[in-house]
Regions:
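Amphipathic alpha-helical polymerization modules
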Residues: 1-278
């Protein structure tokens, strides 16, 4: 009886967390460069129940022999195993702003361990040291003329330097070269991660490595191709229709577990109030 209560409770907790993840995805459906989170639910390891006892052997000396009888497997519930970002490219949105730049995915090698494709990101200077990474190319110029993102983090060049321009009248070519009046100023920095699932997702569409080390440059990486498009932004890759369906499914699963919990509660109430009187 109580084992069933614990199993139902794990199901409700898992579905609640899944609902929170889907809701956050839907809230960021219009956030540039946002990567939708995907959750994985799995069951806890099953337990094998066995009955242990003694049996009398009908002989003259009445020998008691122990026995073990397998009853069967019991599931102990489910849990939300992990949450991973979906790094598929979002659709392009034209903004006609020179400071808006979109990364265009090309070909990436496949990670042998995970079986997933790699991913590329803009390089940003993190104020706490090291680098942060993003797909949100909604950049601006600070008062000093440095190219920064919405958080005020400096956008880095391929050499790891801050990019400064006199005004927003600059041109970004398809290979990432930043030019002012036909004079090359810098090349936008892009980093490559062979297994982006290992990156830590932070607020405002930022990513960092687990140990704080910097990712390798995507330029001159074997098997890596990509491009840039100025006056465009990469939109969120959230599928609103699918997210709504998944949200309803998670809600129904939570509701079903809730009804089972109510049935257990009624059975316990009868056991205490009715059977106890006898």
């Amino acid at each position: 009886m109580f084992k069933g209560l614990y199993t139902v409770a794990t199901g409700m907790i898992a579905q609640q967390r899944k609902t929170e993840i889907i809701t956050n995805n839907m809230a960021n459906a219009n956030t540039p460069g946002f990567k939708a989170d995907q959750s994985t639910i799995r069951s806890f390891p099953d337990m094998l129940l066995s009955a242990v006892g003694n049996t009398n052997i009908p002989v003259d000396k009445k020998i008691n022999a122990p026995f073990i009888q397998e009853i069967g497997a019991v599931n102990t519930g489910i849990y939300l195993q992990e949450t991973l970002a979906n790094h598929a490219q979002g659709s392009l949105i034209e903004t006609n702003k020179t400071t808006d730049i979109a990364l265009i995915d090309g070909l990436f090698p496949i990670d042998e361990e995970s079986g997933n494709s790699g991913a590329i990101f803009f390089r940003l200077e993190h104020p706490d040291g090291g680098e942060a990474y993003t797909r949100n190319g909604n950049f601006t110029l600070d008062p000093e003329g440095y190219l920064v993102n919405g958080n005020g983090y400096y956008v880095l060049s391929d050499t790891g330097e801050r990019i400064i321009v006199p005004n927003d009248n600059f041109v970004v070519s398809g290979d990432g070269t930043v030019s002012v009046d036909d004079v090359e100023v810098a090349t936008l920095g892009v980093s490559f991660s062979l297994n982006p699932a290992l990156l830590v997702k932070q607020d405002n569409g930022l990513f960092q490595t687990v140990d704080g080390t910097n990712l390798a440059s995507a330029f001159n990486q074997e098997g890596v191709t990509f491009g840039f498009k100025q006056n465009f932004l990469e939109g969120s890759n959230v599928d609103s229709a699918k997210s709504m369906t998944d949200l309803l499914t998670a809600y129904r699963a939570f509701e079903a577990n809730q009804k089972v919990l109510q049935a257990y509660d009624k059975s316990m109430e009868k056991a205490v109030n009715e059977i106890g009187r006898v």
